[in-house]
A protein has these predicted regions:
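Short N-terminal binding/cap micro-motifs at the start of the first secondary-structure element
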Residues: 16-18, 25-27, 174
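Iron-sulfur cluster-binding electron-transfer modules in prokaryotic oxidoreductases
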Residues: 72-343
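Cysteine-centered iron-sulfur cluster-binding motifs in ferredoxin-type domains/subunits
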Residues: 3-22, 48-70, 101-102, 295-296, ...
């Protein structure tokens, strides 16, 4: 990022009015002061860095609101990487190294899930690691999505058209069924689903917890894998899609200019197939559902595609919540010191 791009800030403070953290945490100076205003000071003297920048959850709602298109969240995250003195803790390492924890946990998922669900264990995690006992930890799937995909791979190759599915950590370790369901939908559109030869976590948990060098290495690995073919790349996670497209060059200085436009949300890709004349045999679903728009989907401007797909389901009544951050923000809401703000 150009170091002077923050000069486009017109000091209107609209970013601060939309920031979910500054509303409830008086210790956070807000995106304008933490971002453009603070950057002017930091460029003069790095000692002026404010550790309160750690309260930024990188939801990007400040960037959505900014009339001058200042990359406020990027400025804050890059400042944390460059000037931050606070070293990551063991708790931060556990929460952010999702591939490691998932690989260790999925073979023993029933035992791990039962153990971490016990109140005494949760209180012990709170006392020892500051992982708040009031939070319910995500459950692991028994076996990974990539392992389950092996049984589907031969059939996928039979389709004349193909897409690559960047499944991300949640599908791979926590909810493999979501990946299987996506494959069924994509297959119904006459397209096969391939996986990257080697996929690592997109890097967002590492960035959020201060492991920038590790995040950069994983980004480089993912970009190299994506360059092995020229197929469209779809993701069910808006954060994964956003990170692959925008955070790699903006925060990690990993060039993805040759493949950025190939990456999109699965719902956007599906909507485009339907708009081109393909059809899906949708069964009636007489339910009323409430939908919350993820922050990073809002940032990409792609919320409409998901909502329009849901509205195509016969019998489904859709109510869209006001667009607000959910408060969890990846690993942020699991930390004891952030619980009250997260709530």
């Amino acid at each position: 990022m150009n170091d002077t791009r923050f000069e486009s800030c017109i000091k209107c403070t609209v970013c601060t009015t939309t920031c979910p953290v500054s509303r409830v945490n008086p210790r956070y100076p807000g995106p304008k002061q933490a971002g453009p205003d603070g950057e002017r000071l930091r460029l003069k003297d790095g000692a002026l860095y404010d550790e309160a920048l750690k309260y930024c959850i990188n939801c990007k709602r400040c960037e959505v609101a900014c009339p001058s298109d200042v990359k406020i969240g990027d400025i804050i995250q890059r400042a944390r990487a460059q000037y931050g003195q606070q070293k990551p803790t063991l708790r931060d390492a556990i929460l952010s190294h999702t591939d490691l924890m998932g690989t260790l946990s999925t073979p023993f998922a029933p035992l791990v899930n039962a153990t971490t669900g016990l109140k005494p264990v949760r209180r012990l995690l709170d006392a020892a690691l500051k992982i708040d006992h009031r939070r319910t930890l995500p459950k692991y799937g028994f076996g990974t999505f990539r392992r389950a995909y092996r049984q589907l791979a031969a059939r996928q190759a039979q389709y004349p058209e193909q897409v690559v599915f960047f499944h991300g950590c949640y599908v791979n370790y926590n909810h493999p069924q979501l990946g299987k369901d996506l494959i069924r939908v994509v297959n119904a559109l006459g397209t096969g689903v391939q996986l990257l030869s080697k996929e690592k976590c997109c890097g967002v948990p590492l960035i959020a917890n201060g492991f920038f060098d590790k995040a950069r290495k994983q980004a480089q690995s993912n970009v190299a894998a994506m360059r092995e073919n020229t197929l469209p790349i779809i993701a069910t996670s808006s954060t994964c899609a956003f990170t692959l497209r925008d955070e790699y060059p903006h925060l990690l200085d990993v060039d993805n200019s040759d493949l950025r436009d190939r990456v999109e949300l699965a719902t956007r890709w599906i909507w485009k197939q339907l708009a081109a004349g393909r059809t899906l045999p949708l069964r009636p679903l007489p339910l009323k559902v409430v939908y919350h728009t993820p922050c990073h989907m809002e940032k990409m401007g792609w919320s409409l595609y998901t909502l329009e797909l849901l509205r195509l389901i016969p019998g489904l009544q859709l109510e869209v919540l006001d667009s607000q951050c959910c408060g969890i923000a990846g690993t942020y809401g699991f930390k004891t010191e952030n619980y009250a703000v997260s709530q």
